Every structure is written in C-alpha cells, then in structure tokens.
Amino acid sequence: MTEGQIQKQAIELLKLSGYLVFRLNSGRARNNIRLCPPGTPDLLAVKQGRVLWIEMKKPGGALSESQVGMITTLMNHGQEVAVVSGILELQEMI
C-alpha cells in the first residue's frame, strides 16, 4: 500500500472519528506548489482542543532530515506529533 493510499484511509478514519482534518501540502512533487515549510507533517487533525500532527509513512519508510527537524520543532512547542505507517497505528492513537 502506498503512502497516498494510507493517507486517504487515515483522513476517512479521522473524519469518521469527529476530527477536523487538514491535508498539508509541503512538497513540490505534483504541482510545484509549496504551502508549508519543508518537513511539515502530512495531516493536521483537530478535535475538541486536541491538535495532532500526523506524518504518514509506508511500512519501512524513513523520515527525511527536514521531517525529523520539523517534528522536533513541533514537539519542542508542545505539539502532539505522530508518525504512522498504517491505519491500525492511527486508530490506537485516537
């Protein structure tokens, strides 16, 4: 399963669980548009005051240097950040 397929399932699960979900576009892979800084997690989910940044990875996928840096920065600011490689991992978190 690709990261994109996992991400679609994650968005659906989060929405069904009552989260407001934002897909954050930080890369230029498809349309040469960058809306967020490099390394920004793929999803931002909000529910009743809980803010969760989610980086999706295919099983065995590794974080880039910019992703590690951004995740560290977010956590230093008190944010909850998760790196998940499947729906079951995400389901356990929410």
Task: Locate predicted features.
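Catalytic phosphate/metal-binding cores of nucleic-acid and nucleotide-processing enzymes, i.e., regions
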Residues: M1-I94
